[in-house]
């Protein structure tokens, strides 16, 4: 069975291919001028040995060397500009793709792996373009040009130089025949070390509290040991042949061979000294041009691996928009026999869920952890697609809505709230960048966060730090609520929106939310049942199934799952330490 082909970097460097070709052209021109300079140098040295100074040739030599220098520098400039341009394009395309793939793809691959693609792999491809483009011309064009000139100058010494370099290339080729697998193993081991380092540092408070660092440090040490073992194994298997190949591609063996062969023919009066001198310069130049081939090979292999991961993300499945396009007639939400299973799981997360949340109503979703509440509401904005059944907004199947149309319908306040590194005002404006300061402040007042924001030294311009680290959990939650208030979308999904509210602010927050909820369809996930007792309907989930639905009074009267949850909540409210 043949192995799947590794994606070529050339597929994704299409936008800068013209710049790459231009860089190669200038690099090749520099090589031609450099070769001509070597021949001219041999001519000048021969003249000096004959007590003849050729000032015109000396001036021409300086001009050729200077022109080759500037052409080589310009080639590197063009290749680096192309690399920066490609880096910008790829990061934009990756961000656009990740914004359109399902949340399931992001969940399955993980933030760390996707961050590596957008940072390390794009940077690796940058190095491939910036550094390898001029090296291509040097490693391939220079030896060919030098060999052609050598054949013209003296075919015998040309064959001697070619034999030495050919032997070195054979040894090097045997060394790198499985380099792709070795590089992949190296990258995997390095990623394990990076992951262990991040885990060890980020988990330091927990580590010091519970195990003194032994467990987390043990993972880090095992990752380092695995990395070291991989490197030692590679070195033992190919280290000797790799060193031999590199030594044979070094200019020294070629120079020694040309010295011995040239000396033999020179003593036999079969080789003019000037020709011998020219061959020495050209032959060692040809060998020196092959030196970057080793670095070039590794750059290409690393570029292919980076390209493979980038292409995988760029080709990630985007949830399709079905035809014909539909338009919601109102903000009602309807689930019709919806079932869903997470990728790789053996059991459904949701099974045959059906309910209707009329436009302008408040629907509460309750149940134990893992019951399916959050999964259900996250299917509404198509974070995943249901395996069967359908979800409708205003009578329109969400699979027939354009992404921008669908997202314009739904505002979300997640339980695991997230703030970007920026000011408080910027975080509230997320999704509504043109909102005025007055509108931002009004949203903050409604979310009960204006007072603590105004008390900060910089007010609404206060930086929140990485992931909102400078704010408390409750403050972050209220800012995300202010963000949803400002967006003013017809469907509002609240996932434990009051989870971090203290007793003093919970009533104020609930009144603010009650005012916000007017004329909106609200789906609210809550564990504090007292906060949703006045909901228009309550959906009770258990193990992925909708087991009960109705208002508070009706569900209490049924004396079923909801009634037991309510009773447990009442008991917890009156519980005290010590009895």
Language model features: what each stretch is:
Residues 17-71, 152-156:
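Transmembrane helix-loop-helix hairpins at lipid-water interfaces of multipass membrane proteins
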Residues 11-19, 103, 120-129, 133, ...:
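An intracellular "coupling" helix at the cytosolic face of ABC transporter transmembrane type-1 domains
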Residues 212, 236, 286-313:
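Cytosolic ends of transmembrane helices, especially the final helix of ABC transmembrane type-1 domains
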Residues 32-42, 67, 135-176, 234-277:
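A hydrophobic transmembrane-helix motif
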């Amino acid at each position: 069975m043949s192995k799947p082909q590794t994606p070529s970097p050339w597929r994704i460097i299409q936008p800068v291919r013209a710049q790459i070709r231009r860089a190669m052209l200038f690099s090749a021109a520099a090589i031609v001028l450099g070769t001509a300079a070597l021949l001219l140098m041999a001519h000048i040295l021969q003249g000096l040995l004959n007590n003849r100074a050729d000032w015109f040739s000396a001036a021409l030599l300086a001009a050729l060397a200077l022109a080759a220098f500037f052409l080589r520098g310009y080639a590197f400039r063009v290749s680096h500009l192309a690399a920066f341009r490609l880096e910008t394009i790829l990061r934009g395309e990756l961000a656009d793709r990740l914004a359109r793939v399902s949340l399931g793809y992001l969940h399955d691959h993980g933030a760390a792996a996707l961050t590596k693609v957008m940072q390390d792999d794009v940077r690796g491809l940058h190095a491939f373009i910036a550094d390898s483009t001029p090296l291509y011309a040097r490693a391939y064009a220079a030896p060919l040009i030098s060999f052609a000139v050598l054949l013209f100058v003296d075919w015998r010494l040309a064959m001697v130089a070619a034999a030495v370099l050919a032997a070195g290339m054979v040894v090097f080729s045997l060394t790198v025949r499985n380099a792709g697998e070795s590089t992949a193993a190296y990258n995997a081991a390095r990623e394990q070390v990076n992951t262990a380092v991040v885990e060890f540092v980020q988990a330091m408070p927990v580590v010091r509290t519970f195990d003194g660092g032994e467990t987390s440090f043990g993972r880090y040490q095992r990752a380092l040991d695995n990395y070291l073992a991989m490197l030692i194994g590679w070195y033992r298997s190919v280290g000797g042949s790799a060193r031999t190949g590199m030594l044979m591609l070094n200019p020294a063996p070629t120079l020694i061979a040309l010295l011995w062969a040239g000396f033999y023919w020179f003593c036999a009066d079969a080789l003019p000294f000037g020709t011998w001198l020219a061959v020495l310069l050209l032959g060692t130049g040809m060998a020196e041009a092959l030196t970057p081939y080793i670095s070039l090979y590794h750059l290409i292999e690393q570029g292919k691996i980076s390209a493979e991961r980038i292409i995988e993300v760029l080709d990630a499945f985007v949830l399709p928009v079905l035809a014909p396009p539909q338009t919601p007639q109102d903000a009602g939400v309807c689930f019709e026999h919806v079932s869903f299973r997470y990728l790789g799981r053996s059991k459904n997360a949701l099974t045959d869920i059906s309910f209707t949340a009329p436009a302008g109503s408040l629907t509460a979703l309750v149940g134990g952890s893992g019951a399916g509440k959050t999964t259900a509401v996250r299917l509404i904005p198509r974070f995943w697609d249901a395996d069967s059944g359908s979800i409708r907004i205003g009578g329109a199947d969400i699979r027939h809505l354009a992404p921008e149309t669908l997202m314009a319908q739904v505002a979300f306040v997640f339980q695991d709230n997230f703030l970007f590194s920026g000011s408080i005002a910027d975080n509230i404006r997320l999704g509504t960048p043109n909102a005025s300061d007055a509108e931002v402040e009004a949203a903050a007042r409604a979310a009960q966060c204006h007072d603590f924001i105004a008390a900060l030294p910089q007010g609404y311009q206060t930086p929140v730090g990485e992931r909102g680290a400078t704010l408390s959990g409750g403050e972050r939650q209220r800012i995300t609520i202010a963000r949803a208030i400002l967006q003013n979308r017809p469907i509002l999904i609240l996932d434990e929106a009051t989870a971090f509210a203290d007793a003093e602010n919970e009533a104020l927050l609930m009144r603010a939310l009650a005012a916000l909820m007017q004329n909106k369809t609200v789906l609210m996930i809550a564990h504090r049942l007292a906060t949703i007792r006045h909901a228009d309907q309550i959906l009770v989930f258990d193990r992925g199934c909708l087991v009960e639905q109705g208002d508070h009074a009706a569900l209490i009267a049924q004396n079923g799952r909801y009634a037991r949850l309510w009773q447990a909540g009442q008991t917890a409210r009156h519980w005290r330490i010590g009895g």
